[in-house]
């Protein structure tokens, strides 16, 4: 399967749910990459995951071509955040390779 990710808030800090979804899909043999709006029109992904943390962040401005679009996060579903990740996805080690510049020689701690 072809999986695409959209970090709606931008790439200024790692998005933990997208990182965990990336790990889970890669473990299952899927191809995971950032969503590219131009190439998606001739090779649409099977699933696009969109994650948004902040309610003040504008939504993704471009049309999305995919078989399935899944939105999540407090930015979309304040205050409860919407549906939680599946347990097996939640317990995956995050895929820090999605943010090579932000995660170079850096460790992030997430608390909830």
Q: Which residues does each predicted region cover?
A:
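N-terminal [4Fe-4S]-dependent radical SAM core
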Residues: 1, 74-112
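A short, structured N-terminal alpha-helical element that caps or precedes a catalytic domain
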Residues: 1-81
């Amino acid at each position: 399967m072809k999986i695409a990710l959209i970090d709606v808030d931008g790439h200024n800090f790692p998005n933990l749910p997208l990182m965990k979804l990336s790990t889970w899909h890669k473990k299952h043999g899927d191809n995971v990459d950032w969503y590219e709006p131009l190439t998606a029109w001739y090779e649409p992904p099977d699933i696009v995951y969109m994650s948004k943390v902040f309610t003040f962040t504008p939504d993704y401005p471009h049309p999305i071509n995919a078989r399935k679009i899944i939105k999540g996060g407090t930015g979309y579903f304040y205050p409860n955040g919407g549906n939680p990740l599946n347990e097996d996805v939640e317990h995956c080690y995050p895929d820090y390779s999605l943010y090579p510049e932000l995660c170079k020689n850096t460790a992030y701690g997430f608390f909830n």
